[in-house]
Amino acid sequence: MPKLKTKSAVKKRFSLSSSGKLKVTQAGKRHFMRRRTKKQLRNLRGTTTLIGQDAKNIIKYLMPYGVQ
């Protein structure tokens, strides 16, 4: 049976932490920045973690070798 490929789009958008959680960059910082407050922009910096069924599905189906 051939190896399963990881989806390229998922490789670019998600990364796995050492504990197995999915790290994701915050959405909403591409355009229309003028209308947002400084506090909103500050809170959009950095990364967040995906939890729950969404994270499990991404790891299982789109990152087959993500967690061994």
Swiss-Prot record:
<dbReference type="InterPro" id="IPR018265">
    <property type="entry name" value="Ribosomal_bL35_CS"/>
</dbReference>
<keyword id="KW-0689">Ribosomal protein</keyword>
<dbReference type="InterPro" id="IPR037229">
    <property type="entry name" value="Ribosomal_bL35_sf"/>
</dbReference>
<dbReference type="InterPro" id="IPR021137">
    <property type="entry name" value="Ribosomal_bL35-like"/>
</dbReference>
<dbReference type="GO" id="GO:0006412">
    <property type="term" value="P:translation"/>
</dbReference>
<dbReference type="GO" id="GO:0003735">
    <property type="term" value="F:structural constituent of ribosome"/>
</dbReference>
<dbReference type="Pfam" id="PF01632">
    <property type="entry name" value="Ribosomal_L35p"/>
</dbReference>
<dbReference type="InterPro" id="IPR001706">
    <property type="entry name" value="Ribosomal_bL35"/>
</dbReference>
<protein>
    <recommendedName>
        <fullName>Large ribosomal subunit protein bL35</fullName>
    </recommendedName>
</protein>
<dbReference type="GO" id="GO:0022625">
    <property type="term" value="C:cytosolic large ribosomal subunit"/>
</dbReference>
<keyword id="KW-0687">Ribonucleoprotein</keyword>
<comment type="similarity">
    <text>Belongs to the bacterial ribosomal protein bL35 family.</text>
</comment>
